[in-house]
């Protein structure tokens, strides 16, 4: 079966989290035209995606660009910002992204989401990505 990304053509970006099972062959994905990974780093004020750090290392080793996202919830925006920035370890090439979507446990409101984004932008001096 032909992978969808081989039909669409490069450059392509894939979204990963701990919900995507291993093994993931980043070299094979790169050969198929995937040039960037956006990976969940954190959620809320305490969850850390256990696959973030090892997959970051493997994706970069395969020659891909790498970006981190934070799955926002209704907990404290300042707490979420602090948590995300501590875990994501955003280097100068990364902007960070905030994922805002319905969450059965704790959906962030638009006002809170805008405040969270503004806090990250102010702290880093760059504009983070809005991801939904």
Indicate residue ranges for each PLM-predicted region.
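Short beta-strand/loop segments at the ligand-binding rim of alpha/beta enzyme cores
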Residues: 8-10, 65, 125-128
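Surface-exposed substrate-engagement region within the catalytic domains
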Residues: 31-36, 80-132
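A cross-domain feature marking catalytic cores of carbohydrate-active enzymes
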Residues: 16-18, 41, 68-72, 98-102, ...
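Boundary/entry segment of secreted carbohydrate-active catalytic domains
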Residues: 1-43
């Amino acid at each position: 079966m032909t992978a969808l990304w081989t039909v669409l053509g490069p450059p392509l970006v894939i979204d990963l989290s701990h919900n995507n099972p291993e093994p993931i062959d980043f070299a094979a994905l790169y050969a198929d035209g995937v040039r960037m990974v956006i990976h969940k780093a954190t959620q809320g004020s305490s969850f850390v995606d256990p696959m973030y750090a090892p997959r970051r290392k493997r994706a970069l080793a395969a020659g891909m660009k790498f970006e981190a996202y934070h799955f926002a919830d209704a907990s404290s925006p300042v707490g979420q910002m602090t948590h995300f920035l501590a875990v994501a370890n955003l280097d100068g090439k990364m902007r960070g992204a905030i994922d805002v979507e319905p969450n059965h446990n704790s959906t962030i409101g638009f006002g809170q989401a805008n405040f969270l984004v503004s806090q990250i932008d102010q702290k880093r001096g760059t504009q983070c990505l809005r991801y939904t």
